[in-house]
């Protein structure tokens, strides 16, 4: 699971995710990628399951880059606890994805149809709509 080693603040406000991605919207390392099409909070477990699906579909050939990291803590109060008494403890970490952000990349060692299949399977594991992109358009 992806968890930051340190963070400046222990707990943060919820906030809102507005607008499109400012950076990270183009392919940098590989030739195929998965781009977010809508707003979503990607948990560390989503990233890990998507990574596993991609590597298993590619049969560990080619290289996979994870372009996101969950750096925002999400707190939650336990069940059957009354209101008040402070904010709950941290349950998990999320990455706040905006539309246009590249989430995963795959190297060009892999055939395009296999890369598309792997990234479409990974899309099913993520909490938002994504699309397949490539440098070969």
Curated annotation (Swiss-Prot):
Quaternary data: Part of the 50S ribosomal subunit.
UniProt keyword list: Ribonucleoprotein, Ribosomal protein, RNA-binding, rRNA-binding, tRNA-binding
Primary role: Binds 23S rRNA and is also seen to make contacts with the A and possibly P site tRNAs.
UniProt record similarity statement: Belongs to the universal ribosomal protein uL16 family.
GO CC annotations on file: cytosolic large ribosomal subunit
CDD domains (alphabetical): Ribosomal_L16_L10e
Protein name per Swiss-Prot or TrEMBL: Large ribosomal subunit protein uL16
Source domain of life: Bacteria
Pfam families linked: Ribosomal_L16
Any one Gene Ontology molecular-function term assigned to this protein's record: structural constituent of ribosome
PROSITE patterns: RIBOSOMAL_L16_1, RIBOSOMAL_L16_2
The keyword Cell division appears for this protein: no
Family annotation (InterPro entries): Ribosomal_uL16 (IPR047873), Ribosomal_uL16_bact-type (IPR000114), Ribosomal_uL16_CS (IPR020798), Ribosomal_uL16_dom (IPR016180), Ribosomal_uL16_sf (IPR036920)
GO BP terms in the entry: translation
Gene3D superfamilies: Ribosomal protein L10e/L16 (3.90.1170.10)
